Amino acid sequence: MKIRSLLFAAAFLAAAPALADTWSRNGAEALLKTWCDALVKYQVGGTGDAALDGGMLCPACCFEHGRAADSVYALVYEWKRTGERKYLDAAERVFDWTGRNMVSYDGANYNDVKHYWRGITVFSQTSLGKTLIAFGGELPQDLRAKWLARFRVQTDFLVGYFSKGLGDSNINYPITFCEAMAVAWKILGDDAYKAKGDAMFALVRPLFLECGLLAGEGHPSTGISPRGCRPIDLGYNMEESIPALYHYAELTGRADIAKDLDRLVAGHLEFILPDGGLDNSMGSRSCKWTYWGSRTSDGLLPALAHYAKHGGKGAVRAIDRHLKLLAKCTSDTGLLYGGLYYREAGEPPCIHHTFAHVKSIVDLLLAAPPEKSADEPLPREEEYGRRSFPDFATELAAVGPWRASFSANDNYSNRGPVNVGGGSPTMLWHRDMGVVAAATMFSYFYAEPTNFQDQRRYIGVETLTPRIDCEGFSNVMDAGAKTTADFSGGAFAYSAKGVLTGKDGAKGAPFEIAYRLDAKGLSVRARAEGKFRYVFPVVATEKDEVVVEGNTARVKRPGGTLTLTADREIKLLDTQRGKRAFTPVAGLMAAVFYIEGEDGEAGLSVVVE
């Protein structure tokens, strides 16, 4: 582990009494400072070019992302905490750069140069508004006046932009509009803003599902797929929508919806892994999954903070685990990586993750939830067997040391081959080893051009979803696959039956897959007509020892040795990297194992020794 990571670990390892959960405020402050210092470091200056000076240069994307002024909230917080003027200066410079380069004729902010999506004005307005609410009285008078003027213009734009209700945008936008109107009401004092936020909330409320999840991250937000799936994305829900609703409720005094929001957090907490990661492998916007959350949303700490303040079970532990995960995923340059193994893959961090998620630490610190609670396990630390979420065709399994998710979800926000379903295991996690396998988008492409990262030196990205493959056809793309799930005798069983499908929807041969997970491990039986491969990528860095001998393969990782045994020869895929594949989705690196079959069944098992 690098020196910076060791320092973070020391900050977070504050003494905790036995049988109690704690999170470290000092550790959160340290991480916030590291991220703010990195943002200051990457801020452009001295060129004399108004199109460049004040923006923040991204080492991964090699340009200045348009939403960098969202960081004003955190930079001003750090100025107040430390008294160091550099943070306030950086906030003013990035705000001014945005005004010169990222504001359209009607006062809206847009996403990036050449990416004129203006809905993100709602995030710019709420970030600026929260800054004015928390620190406006302490800002220099001329600076406050300048920021307040921009806030008014943004607010006026939003009122018109969201005048048609939910529209066709993902639900996090109308939800954040509720927050934006509450913030405007708080700052400007006009009751009309509160009324508009309340009216929008009335449209949003029906998307709170009985299962404890929030629907709406899709087009349309109220849509239901042929399978009956709702557009559910755990990342955007926990990192954007639920925090915005908590803030809306807090500002407007809507105590009546606090219990509903707590129930949503409890439902989404089912998908928090024991290491603080968020299993959004199967979500409707899983193409933006980062393991700790989602690429360009704001962070799940505020949702956990409010839930903890309301006595939510497991909230304090979740805050602690998640903060430690964020620290682990922070680079030596001080920027947040978009997943687990970017460092090991030699890929730089995109600055967007940092300037977006730094806000969530400020929200956590200002909310000041309890730093200690009784010892309360996270739901996925419990060995409960099986839990079903039919609203997006997903099954969770908790058996012995294993935690898994399987999905046949067919409702995705982004058009294109982003699928991870078709009756696939989307997460296989082990108590001692962490992530063993996970699903990632079937064919990697820039679903949102300026919001996606690619490999610096390698062309093409392998999907890491365990699957049947046959010359471009796969079970993963079969939206109509029939699935079954059962838990009995200490084992979870899951099966899928359908037609191998290409990324353009073309149909191929029939297939069947059966999975069985017990305390020992996972077994797979795959069947298809004609020649096929069953592919099972195992998370492994280039430092992890991989040995393939006939029908057996072993992966030695910290925490144990994973052994794959098949009824035929196991092969290891050659890639441009050699014997590993890397995907920007969740930042996973893997050894891609496969077995070959023809007109019959092929079997494989996975255990940890």
Which functions belong to the PLM regions below?
Residues D256-K259, L269-A566:
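Extended polysaccharide-engagement surfaces of secreted carbohydrate-active enzymes
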Residues F8-A15:
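Bacterial N-terminal signal peptides
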Residues A20-D70, Y77-V103, R152:
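Low-complexity, Ser/Thr/Pro/Gly-enriched N-terminal "stalk/linker" regions
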Residues M1-L7:
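Bacterial N-terminal signal peptides that target proteins for export
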Residues D567-E609:
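Beta-strand-rich recognition/accessory modules
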Residues K41-A69, Y105-F123, V159-I175, C211-E240, ...:
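Solvent-exposed loop and edge beta-strand segments that line ligand/cofactor-binding
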Residues D21-W23, A69-R85, F123-D142, T176-D191, ...:
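Well-ordered alpha-helical scaffold segments within catalytic/enzyme domains
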Residues Q141-S221, G228-C229, L234, E250, ...:
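Eukaryote-skewed repeat-based solenoidal scaffolds used as protein-protein interaction platforms
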